[in-house]
Amino acid sequence: MQSSRKIMILKRNIKGLKSSAIIATYLTLNKLFIDKFCKTQESTYPIHFVHCHFGGIKKFHSHCQLSSSYTNSGQKSFKSFNSLRFIVLKSKTCLLRYKLLIKTFCCITYSKIENLSNTRMARLTAPSKGPSFSNLNKPNDLLKAEIEDNEASHYSQNQSSDSDSDEAPEEVSLKSSSDEVKKRLQRLKGNELQLRKAEREKRRLQNERNRERNAQRVSASKLDLAILEAAEVEEINSTTEIEEKVDEASLDLYTPKGHKIVFPNNEIPKKRTRSFRKGDFKVSVLKETNDPLLAPNYEKKLSQRKRDWINRQSVPRASKRRRPLTY
C-alpha cells in the first residue's frame, strides 16, 4: 500500500522566476511535512510554502496531488490538463534526498508570488480557498470522485489548448530522460549494495581471523605456562632426590683436580691465526670460466707476472726520432 502512493508535482509556466530560486525553494521544504504528506490517502492538496530569497521573503503557491495512476508494471504515467504537466514520483523518494531528480525533471514554476516583508518565519499554511488537510479522513471513493471532478473542470476550461496533448514532445523527452535517471539510480543503488556487502564480508573474515589468532595466543600461553610449571616441579623433584642420594664424601672422588673448569658464560680464547709478514703475497686461484670481464693473463703465476714487469722496466722505450725539416 505504501509503495502505491505517489506524489505528482504540477508545474505552471511563469516568466521572471529563476531556476535557482525554484530549486532552492524545494530544498527548504520540511522533511517531516513531506513524509506526512506522502503517507496520507489519495487526495488533492493545495500547498503554500515560504522561502527567503535575496533578502526578501516570497510566498510561492504550488499544487500537489496524490493519485493512483502509477501502474503495477512500474512505468510512469504522464498526463496533462489545464496547462498543467506533472510527473509521478514514488512516495519513498524524498525531495531532499534526490535533488538531482528534482532539478532535472520537476521544473516547477509557481502561479502566485507575493512579497511578505513583515514575515520572519517560514510557515506551511493553507490557501484562502479552503483548508489544506480538510479531507484527510475521507473515504477513498469520495476522494477519487473529487479528483475526477477536478480533472473534468480543468479539461472543460482549456479544450482549445493543443500544447497539452498526451503526445507532446516535451512529455516524451521527460519520460525518456526520467527512465534513464531511474535506471541510473537503480545501478548506483545496486553498486552501493554490492560495496556494502563486500565490506561486511571483509570485516567478518577479519574478525574471524582475529578471533582465531587470539584463541591460538591464549592456548599457547596456557601451554607455555603449563610446560614451565611442569619443568619447575620436575627440577624441584630432581634436586631433592640428588640431595637425598648423593653423599658429600663421594663428590670429592669425581671432582677434577688441576684442571680449569670453563663455564659457558666465560669467554673462550680465540684461536691463533697465521700472520703474514710484510712483503708476502697471498694468491687466490680463480676457476677457469668464459667470463670476459676477467683481465687477460689472469691464470699466470704471480712470480711470472712480477718477472715480466721487471723485464719491461729494464728495456728502455724506443724514442721517437724527429723527422728532418724539409723545405
UniProtKB/Swiss-Prot annotation:
Record's subcellular location: Nucleus, Nucleolus
Main location: nucleus
Domain of life, source organism: Eukaryota
InterPro entries, sorted: UTP16 (IPR013268)
Gene Ontology molecular function terms on file: snoRNA binding
Gene Ontology BP terms: maturation of SSU-rRNA
Coiled-coil stretches noted in the UniProt entry, renumbered to this chain: 180-219
Residue ranges, compositional bias (Basic and acidic residues): 194-215
Modified-residue entries (Phosphoserine), positions: 163, 165
Stretch list, region Disordered: 151-218
Entry's Gene Ontology cellular component terms: nucleolus; nucleus; small-subunit processome; sno(s)RNA-containing ribonucleoprotein complex
Pfam family, one: U3_snoRNA_assoc
This protein's UniProt keywords: Coiled coil, Nucleus, Phosphoprotein, Ribonucleoprotein, Ribosome biogenesis, rRNA processing
Entry keyword Phosphoprotein: yes
Function (record text): Functions as part of the small subunit (SSU) processome, first precursor of the small eukaryotic ribosomal subunit that coordinates the first two steps of ribosome biogenesis in transcription of the primary transcript pre-RNA and pre-18S processing. During the assembly of the SSU processome in the nucleolus, many ribosome biogenesis factors, an RNA chaperone and ribosomal proteins associate with the nascent pre-rRNA and work in concert to generate RNA folding, modifications, rearrangements and cleavage as well as targeted degradation of pre-ribosomal RNA by the RNA exosome.
Family: Belongs to the UTP16 family.
Subunit description: Component of the ribosomal small subunit (SSU) processome.
UniProt protein name: U3 small nucleolar RNA-associated protein 16
Naturally occurring in which organism (per UniProt): Schizosaccharomyces pombe (strain 972 / ATCC 24843) (Fission yeast)
